[in-house]
Every structure is written in C-alpha cells, then in structure tokens.
C-alpha cells in the first residue's frame, strides 16, 4: 500500500510538471527517413507536404516486408490453383458482373475481356486481396536503404539460413533502392494528383496497389479513368480494367494476336513464364463467357 501511494504521488507530480507545448504533436514517429525527406524536397516536392506525411504516426520502416526481397526463395506461388473449376466459375461471374467496363475496354483498347479477367484473377483474385501493407512505408523503406543504417537494419532482420551472401545483398539493395525511390516519387505525385492521402493506401510489400496491382510509375503512365468520373482509382474495378487493357495495348496487343506475341505482351506485366502461361490458359478456358 505504501508503494502504491508513492507511485500515485509521483504520477501526480509528473502530470503537474510543465511539458514542452506541442511536444507530442511534433515528435517524429521514425527518424530513419530524414535524408529521404531532404531528397524529395530537393527533387521538387513541397517541404510542408513531405513533412506532414512523414510525421504521421503510421509511417515507419517496413522491415518485415522488405526483408522478403532478400531471402532465398524456396517456393513459388501455386499458379495451378487459378485453373480449378471453382475459381474459373468465379471468374465467369466476374465477367458478367463487370460486363460493361470489360466491353468498353475491348472496344477502346482491343483487349478481350477474358484476358483482362485472367490477369485480375491471378493478381488479386478479382480484387479480393490487394495487399495489407502501407505502400508509403514499403517504398520509403526501400528508398531509404541508400542509408547504411537502414540497410543494416534490413540485413539483420533476415534469418541467417535465408540470407543471400552479403555481396549479393548489397548488389540487390543498390538496385532496389534506386528503383524504389523512383516509385516513391511517382506514388507521391499520383496521390497529389488524385487528392488521395498516401498514408491510407495499402498494397503489396513490393509497393504494387489496387485491383490491378500497378506499381506507381505504371499508374502515371498507363492507368485510365474507366468509369468516367474524372479520377483514376486503381481500387475501382472499371478503372483497373481500363488500365490493364491500356497497358497491354501499349506493349503491342492487337486484334487476332497470336499466342507467341500475346505471351511477349503479357510478359511485360509480370516477367514470369509461369505467370504468363497461366494467364493465357485461364483466358482460353474463359472464352465464350458472356
């Protein structure tokens, strides 16, 4: 009882003591992005905009997600699951639900509904899973790996039995941090253009977002307003459908395209032979759906 009374007395004294005004509001949640903020402002972003973003309490290093980039990959996604009859039936239902935007995409870009649907199925299970990591944290953490301290934090987070060699890690980190900085700039530009709070956008640990899983530079280059509401929202199915079709058209999709050329076009979406062959197989099985 004596100890309890003493603790209460000390707590009252602490509460009565003066504290710096605004200390809680201005304290940075994470100091690892200071040099990154300087770079962004130097590259043309408004200082107030950048400071406001990075002082948000939800902004922090995405250590767990980014470490996945640097682990030995012992398994790959089971793409065969997407050709199961129950999954294909969901894809057929999706094609009926979004018949109009799919038809509009085919009219405007020449890409058949079954091809767009196949990509959406493999990417996000038709929008059911678009990722749960803050895109800002993922891209900022990768971009901040230009700083040796951040890079060491990522290295130490990787289990020893899953690590690349340190030389391989450094080489990959150099490539990834340059890529991520470009993606971060594109992401912030997109969020400003569409008046979206960048701290609220979730996606994959690689920084891809929306139903179509576009990376930010692809959003700026290829994303389209599919529902004619004056905005580009990759979490909206009509926008995602139009954006995928526009992307494929840009890389050479055309009417009556052969399988070999179709393979080359889709390979630009995801540089995996397994992925491309699965998309083409799904599209073939969906032919005739209306």
What positions do the PLM features span?
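Cell-wall glycan-active module
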Residues: 1-207, 211-213, 217-290
